[in-house]
């Protein structure tokens, strides 16, 4: 219980001082959004020295994201060696629960739900770290499918927060080994990755990234090819609306 309390407190601190995030908006509307979270459990996601400190980034960005995007629910997907088939699972959290009695305080219920969602994000991260690997594409596909299924006939907007450096590295494909300098090379690499795999059903979704391209082992001269590789997949082919944390 003490650990859980400390965790929630740490995550709540992320609400302060996070202006300028890619999802920041002056829109004060009340439209609700079904949201998803992709959590990278690969070895590069353990600290800022080896890549992206995913736990730290979650503490800094998750609650502001939920608040500023008016998320009504939060679903989860892990980045592991085989993200589609990973046993790391958590049911979507209802962030706007209906009061059961006339004396229930709706704002208190919402805060409890947000705290539960924050705690579940760390549970997902801890599980993913035990499976290692970095199938980012599979995680995006899994979260997109989950959101489509849970959305049902209610319509509404869909948004995904992906905390990952996007260094695809699974048993069948390692992005770091692919030449990406020319358009032809990038197209071959994209086709190679997508061979036998589903393109994430992200069409029309807002995809917000934290840690994108931040792996310190990647040479600065290779970033443009890396970025164009993912732009081809996410924007051109999947037709997502992508927002990176440095924009």
Where are these regions (language model features)?
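Von Willebrand factor
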Residues: 30-100, 102-156, 159-160
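VWA/integrin I-like adhesion module and closely mimicked acidic/polar interface patches used
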Residues: 167-222
């Amino acid at each position: 219980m003490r650990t859980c309390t400390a965790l929630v407190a740490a995550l709540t601190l992320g609400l302060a001082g996070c202006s300028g995030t890619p999802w920041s908006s002056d829109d004060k509307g009340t439209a609700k959004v079904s949201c998803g979270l992709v959590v990278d459990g690969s070895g590069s996601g353990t600290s800022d020295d080896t890549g992206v400190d995913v736990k730290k980034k979650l503490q800094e960005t998750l609650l502001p994201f939920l608040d500023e995007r008016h998320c009504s629910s939060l679903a989860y997907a892990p980045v592991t060696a085989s993200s589609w088939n990973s046993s790391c699972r958590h049911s979507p959290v209802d962030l706007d629960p209906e009061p059961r009695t006339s004396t229930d305080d709706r704002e208190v219920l919402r805060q409890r739900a947000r705290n539960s969602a924050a705690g579940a994000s760390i549970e997902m991260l801890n599980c993913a770290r035990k499976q290692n690997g970095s199938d980012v594409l599979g995680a995006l596909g899994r979260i997109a499918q989950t959101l489509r299924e849970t959305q049902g006939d209610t319509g509404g907007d869909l948004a995904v927060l992906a905390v990952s450096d996007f260094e695809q590295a699974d048993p069948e494909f390692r992005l770091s080994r692919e030449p990406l300098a020319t358009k032809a090379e990038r197209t071959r690499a994209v086709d190679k990755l997508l061979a036998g795999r589903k393109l994430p059903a992200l069409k029309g979704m807002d995809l917000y990234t934290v840690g994108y391209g931040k792996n310190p082992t990647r040479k600065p001269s290779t970033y443009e090819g890396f970025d164009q590789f993912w732009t081809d997949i996410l924007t051109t082919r999947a037709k997502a609306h992508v927002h990176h944390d440095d924009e």
